[in-house]
Amino acid sequence: MVSRTTTSIPINFRGVGVYKTFANKNLLYCNCNIVSMEKTDLLMMTFAIVNLADYMTTVKGIEMGFHELNEFVSSLNPASFLLLKIAIVATAFALLLYTRRLSFSLGRGIYIGLVAGLAISTAVLGICSVHNLLLLTGFPEVEFLVKVMTGVLALI
């Protein structure tokens, strides 16, 4: 029977923990434990994707003759609307990066408030994007779903 003595050496770099295990007889055993992405990074990525989906469905809907309810958005051309979406995502990302590093309690409160606001905004914008997508595909029960979603949002 061969006995092995092992040593773990943790190496950490930006959100990833890698543990390399060395054993006797020049054998190398690697156990890579990749820590999952931080929840706020996942939220920011989701926020950016939902904003892109909202942009594409809104522009396509206007091209197909649908009426945009937001008067400000309907006054923009597609290029300026895209710049607005990019500015919104970049500003939210910069604020999250800045407030993430704050250590005092007010800074942490601002950070938590930003995360909560982005989560709510992502959920509502996601619902709007799905609604636009259903309208674009000609889904006949969209108006019923709009009434259901409006009722659910009114309860929240």
Swiss-Prot record:
Keywords carried by this UniProt record: Cell membrane, Membrane, Transmembrane, Transmembrane helix
Recorded coiled-coil stretches: none
Membrane topology of the entry: Multi-pass membrane protein
InterPro entries: DUF5658
GO cellular component: plasma membrane
Residues passing through the membrane, by range: 42-59, 79-98, 105-127
Domain of life of the native organism: Archaea
UniProt name for this protein: Uncharacterized protein AF_1335
Organism: Archaeoglobus fulgidus (strain ATCC 49558 / DSM 4304 / JCM 9628 / NBRC 100126 / VC-16)
